[in-house]
Amino acid sequence: MRQTKTGILLANLGTPDSPTPEAVKRYLKQFLSDRRVVDTSRLLWWPLLRGVILPLRSPRVAKLYASVWMEGGSPLMVYSRQQQQALAQRLPETPVALGMSYGSPSLESAVDELLAEHVDHIVVLPLYPQFSCSTVGAVWDELARILARKRSIPGISFIRDYADNHDYINALANSVRASFAKHGEPDLLLLSYHGIPQRYADEGDDYPQRCRTTTRELASALGMAPEKVMMTFQSRFGREPWLMPYTDETLKMLGEKGVGHIQVMCPGFAADCLETLEEIAEQNREVFLGAGGKKYEYIPALNATPEHIEMMANLVAAYR
C-alpha cells in the first residue's frame, strides 16, 4: 500500500507588494471585494469602493506601510516567510508552502507548489488563532474555488482554529512573562484582537467567543486576576458597529482614569503586520500617553520564534 505524502499549506491574509499607492490600491481592491470581508450589496459597494475608498485610502495607507516596511518586504511577508522556512526545517520530510488570501503568493500558487511535490494530502493551517468567517472562512472559500478547477484533488485536512491550543497559550504566556521581566509588571495587560462587524457575530460567527476563550486561558496560564487582563477590539472600518470595547477608546479612557502602565498584546495576529506595528505599537501608544498614561509597551507577535514553530509542528502532526 502506497504511503500518503502530506504537504502543509500555511495561509494568511496578505499584503501589498510594495508601499506605494498603486500596489496598496491593487491589494485593497482584492481584499475589500471579498464578500467574506464586506458583504454589502454590490450595487451599493462597487461605486463606493472604486470611486471613493480606493482613491482616498490608498495613498494614506501606503504611507503607513512605508513607515513599517522592512528590507525583505512588508513585516507580514517577512515573518510569514520566516515561519514557512522554519517549519520546513523542523519537518524536513514535509513540503511547506505559503499562500495568501489576497496578493502574492496566492493560495492557488501554494496549492500548485504542493501538488508539484506530488503530495496527495494537504494540511491547511490558516494562521488565525481564532476562527472568523471573514478570515478562516475566506481561506476555505478560495481553497474550494481552486480545487473546483482541478481534475484530481488531494485529501484536505483543514484546521479551523487553535484558540485554546495548549502550546499556543503557553507560547503567548511565555512572551508576556518575558515582557514583564523586561519592563516590570503593568497595571493592566490589554489583549487587543482584530474586530469584526457586530452583525457578523449576531448572525453566527463565533469569533468573539473564541477570543474570550484565548483571553481566559492566557490569564489562567499567567495566574493573573481577571481585573488585571482586559480584552478589546481594534481596526474597525466603516460606519456600522463593530465588536466592542474598541481598543483606542479604551486606552484613552484608561489613561484619563489614571492607569499608569499598560502592556498590549495582540494574540490574534500570528505575525506582526501594519495593524500591530503601526496601529498598536505607535498610534495607540500616542492615544494612551496623550490621555495621561505614563508607560506603554507593545508585546510582539509570536512570529517565527522557536516556540511558535514548535506549536505549528505539533498542531499539524495530528493530521499528517
Curated annotation (Swiss-Prot):
Binding site for Fe cation: 194, 275
Protein name: Ferrochelatase
Catalysed reaction, written as an equation: heme b + 2 H(+) = protoporphyrin IX + Fe(2+)
Function: Catalyzes the ferrous insertion into protoporphyrin IX.
Family from the record: Belongs to the ferrochelatase family.
UniProt keyword terms in alphabetical order: Cytoplasm, Heme biosynthesis, Iron, Lyase, Metal-binding, Porphyrin biosynthesis
Assembly and binders: Monomer.
Pathway annotation from the record: Porphyrin-containing compound metabolism; protoheme biosynthesis; protoheme from protoporphyrin-IX: step 1/1
Entry's Gene Ontology molecular function annotations: ferrochelatase activity; metal ion binding
GO biological process, any: heme biosynthetic process
PANTHER family: FERROCHELATASE, FERROCHELATASE, MITOCHONDRIAL
PROSITE patterns for the chain: FERROCHELATASE
